[in-house]
């Protein structure tokens, strides 16, 4: 198990054009929890400011953005470009560690879990899927680092 600082705290981000799902984990337990979603703002700079407010409230030390890599190595989507730009803004405005993490199919997996395992309606799933996707992204990142 890697040693870690007692004050490490992670924010998982599942970016979408309308909503951004959020998840949080902090040392020493690093249990990843969905913490809801925020609406995407009219500009990436405003969206970065909204995220920074949450980062400060929770004393986050590392931000993990889901990065929707294409299934086939072709071209980057406009969403992927926006995520990269938003991640750079957050990094520049906070000087925190910002990581782009492969999130292929995390939103689809979250939707499937909510539909099949939880039996939620489409409206209920819409309200929960973004933060669950962020939870899956952050959990995957933490698992890869063997921080649990």
UniProtKB/Swiss-Prot annotation:
Enzyme Commission code(s) on record: 3.1.-.-
GO molecular function: nuclease activity
Pfam family, one: RuvX
The keyword RNA-binding is assigned to this record: no
SUPFAM superfamilies assigned: Ribonuclease H-like
Any one biological process term the GO annotation gives: rRNA 5'-end processing
Location(s), subcellular: Cytoplasm
GO cellular component, one term: cytosol
Main localization of the protein described in the UniProt heading: cytoplasm
Claim: Cytoplasm is one of the keywords in the record: yes
Keyword tags: Cytoplasm, Hydrolase, Nuclease, Ribosome biogenesis
Similarity annotation: Belongs to the YqgF nuclease family.
NCBIfam families: RNAse_H_YqgF (TIGR00250)
Its job: Could be a nuclease involved in processing of the 5'-end of pre-16S rRNA.
Name of the protein described by the UniProt record: Putative pre-16S rRNA nuclease
Source organism of this protein record: Chlamydia muridarum (strain MoPn / Nigg)
């Amino acid at each position: 198990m890697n040693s870690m600082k007692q004050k490490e705290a992670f924010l998982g981000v599942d970016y979408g054009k309308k909503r951004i799902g959020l998840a949080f984990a902090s040392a020493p337990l690093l249990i990843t929890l969905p913490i809801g979603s925020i609406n995407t703002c009219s500009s990436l700079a405003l969206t970065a400011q909204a995220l920074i407010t949450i980062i400060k409230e929770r004393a986050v030390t590392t931000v993990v953005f889901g990065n929707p890599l294409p299934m086939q190595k072709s071209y980057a989507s406009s969403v992927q470009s926006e995520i990269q730009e938003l991640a750079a803004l957050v990094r520049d405005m906070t000087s925190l560690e910002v990581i782009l993490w492969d999130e292929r199919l995390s939103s689809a997996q979250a939707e499937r879990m909510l539909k099949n395992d939880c039996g939620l309606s489409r409206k209920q799933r819409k309200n929960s899927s973004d933060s669950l996707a962020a939870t899956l992204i952050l959990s995957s990142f933490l698992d890869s680092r063997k921080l649990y």
